[in-house]
C-alpha cells in the first residue's frame, strides 16, 4: 500500500509540474493560463496530502528518495506531450534513478 501511495503522490506532483509547463506555452488570453495554473495548484495540493499520508507510515529517509520517480514521470510525459528530445545521457540518468529507487524501495 505504501508504494502505491508514493507512486500516487509522484503522479500528482508530475501532473502539477506538467500543468505549469503548459501554462508557459498557452496563448489566447488570461483564462487558459489561470486554468492551467489552477490545475497545477490543485494537483500539487493533492500530492502534498497523499505525501503526508506516506510520511505517517514510511521513514522519511526511505520515502524521500522515492520522489525521484518524478524525474522519470516528467521525462516520459515531456517526451510524449511536447516531443522533447531524450539524449543518451538523459536516458542513462533516468535508468540510474530507476535503479536507485528500486534499491531504496526494497525495504518492504
Curated annotation (Swiss-Prot):
Its main location: membrane. It comes from the Bacteria. Gene3D superfamilies: 1.10.3730.20. The keyword Transmembrane helix applies. GO terms for biological process: lipid A biosynthetic process; lipopolysaccharide biosynthetic process. InterPro entries: EamA_dom, Flippase_ArnE, Small_drug/metabolite_transptr. The chain crosses the membrane at residues 32-52, 58-78, 85-105. HAMAP family: Flippase_ArnE (MF_01869). This is Probable 4-amino-4-deoxy-L-arabinose-phosphoundecaprenol flippase subunit ArnE. It comes from Erwinia tasmaniensis (strain DSM 17950 / CFBP 7177 / CIP 109463 / NCPPB 4357 / Et1/99). The gene is arnE.
Amino acid at each position: 500500500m505504501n508504494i502505491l501511495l508514493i507512486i500516487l503522490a509522484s503522479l500528482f506532483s508530475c501532473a502539477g509540474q506538467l500543468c505549469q509547463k503548459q501554462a508557459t506555452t498557452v496563448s489566447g488570453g488570461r483564462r487558459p493560463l489561470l486554468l492551467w495554473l489552477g490545475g497545477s495548484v490543485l494537483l500539487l495540493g493533492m500530492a502534498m496530502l497523499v505525501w503526508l499520508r506516506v510520511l505517517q507510515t514510511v521513514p522519511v529517509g526511505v520515502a524521500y528518495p522515492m520522489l525521484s520517480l518524478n524525474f522519470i514521470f516528467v521525462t516520459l510525459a515531456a517526451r510524449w506531450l511536447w516531443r522533447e528530445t531524450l539524449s543518451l545521457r538523459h536516458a542513462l540518468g533516468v535508468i540510474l534513478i530507476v535503479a536507485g529507487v528500486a534499491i531504496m524501495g526494497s525495504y518492504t
